[in-house]
Amino acid sequence: MTTFSPREIVSELDRFIVGQKDAKRAVAIALRNRWRRQQLKGPLRDEVAPKNILMIGPTGCGKTEIARRLARLAGAPFLKIEATKFTEVGYVGRDVEQIVRDLVEVGIGLTREEKRKAVKAKAEAAAESRILDALVGPTASQATRESFRKKLRASELDDKEVEIELAPSGSQGLPMFEIPGMPGASMGAINISDMLGKALGGQRGKPRRITVAEAYAPLIAEESDKLVDDDALTREAIREVEDNGIVFLDEIDKICAREGRSGADVSREGVQRDLLPLIEGTTVATKHGPVKTDHILFIASGAFHVSKPSDLLPELQGRLPIRVELQPLTVEDFKQILTATEASLIKQTVALMETEGVTLDFTEDAIDALARVAVEVNGSVENIGARRLQTVLERVIDEISFTATDRSGETVPIDAAYVRDRVEDLAANADLSRFIL
């Protein structure tokens, strides 16, 4: 779990996301509160519940990007999932408890990586020993092994092929048992594939011929797993999920039951009802054991173009107490997105063209023109936020991108006149939807 202060979290998000100070502050405080709760002792620690967040803002303003960047910062089990993937219990499809099962799998993966790092030195030594066995045989003299060990460490044998036996991962080789109509869902607390694997005594790996360089990574992973206690790892992962898990529930506005509509919307309202106990706190059965959701942080987000936040069930609104409104992006914001962020669109485009030997030189007025065209098109067609910049920029460099292979060594200046020549005629057209999607 991250120990960053709220100010440090916001400054990290600022490197990649323009504006939206309120949303950044809200998620930074929520993330820091996870750490603060860990410092409490006694029964008070169990009483402190997470303050779940509802982010409201137009499409393309940064809601999902905040989630993506937060996942890297959190250092905790983090799951981003769309609310539209789920159906009411009783309907064909995935039920919302799958969220917790998926989060547990993420937690186990994170914990396994940490455990592997802790035993990496021992695992590397064991992997080296297995490669030496494959090269010179287990009965070779110590002097021979040491001679080959030196060559191995000097990377002199990397291209040599060896035959090694790798155990299949998980229940590989056995058929997967899924509930019909529920792709990816396991049968509650029982995983039939795992049970059959154990009953059959596991699967022996087939010998494979690969180079020494390719053999290292899978051998180290296999030897690491031998040194890790799976039961202890699972218990630790579940504890980490229960205490520090974060779920980002995107597109929550799409499960609102709209006024005057019926039919399929019944299932939408059912999904909201199913979410209530999950967000409030319940125990979910998974194949790894029961998981409590009392202290899992839920961050929901939606554009709410067609529906309103008040269309959510009142009980669900009450379980998302912190409301954050994200602002539509301005021309200045668009200019910042094009140039100021760490992996800005202009930097990406210039780097891609440099691979062909073509240097793109964007002037200040070109960047201003790109931003203004994007804002105009958003205003006259459909506001898709910052995603519009990608469409406009691709239109501008379309010809250069197509002929770049033949123009190696050239420097291509792109100014406002060049941008207008490529896209301004479209911006002036009232019906742009035929040209820009």
From Swiss-Prot:
> What is the organism lineage in this UniProt record?
Bacteria, Pseudomonadati, Pseudomonadota, Alphaproteobacteria, Hyphomicrobiales
**GO CC terms for this protein?**
HslUV protease complex
Q: What is its main location?
A: cytoplasm
**How the protein assembles, per its UniProt entry?**
A double ring-shaped homohexamer of HslV is capped on each side by a ring-shaped HslU homohexamer. The assembly of the HslU/HslV complex is dependent on binding of ATP.
Q: Which Gene3D superfamilies match?
A: 1.10.8.60, P-loop containing nucleotide triphosphate hydrolases
Q: What is this protein called?
A: ATP-dependent protease ATPase subunit HslU
Query: Per its UniProt entry, which superkingdom is the organism in?
Result: Bacteria
What protein family does this chain belong to?
A: Belongs to the ClpX chaperone family. HslU subfamily.
Detail which positions bind ATP.
Answer: V18, G60, C61, G62, K63, T64, E65, D250, E315, R387
What are its GO biological-process terms?
protein unfolding; proteolysis involved in protein catabolic process
Where, subcellularly, is it found? Cytoplasm
Care to name a GO molecular-function term for this sequence?
A: peptidase activity
Report the SMART domains cross-referenced here. Answer: AAA, ClpB_D2-small
Keyword RNA-binding among record annotations: no
> What task does this protein carry out?
ATPase subunit of a proteasome-like degradation complex; this subunit has chaperone activity. The binding of ATP and its subsequent hydrolysis by HslU are essential for unfolding of protein substrates subsequently hydrolyzed by HslV. HslU recognizes the N-terminal part of its protein substrates and unfolds these before they are guided to HslV for hydrolysis.
Which key words are in the record?
ATP-binding, Chaperone, Cytoplasm, Nucleotide-binding, Stress response
* Any Pfam family the entry gives: AAA
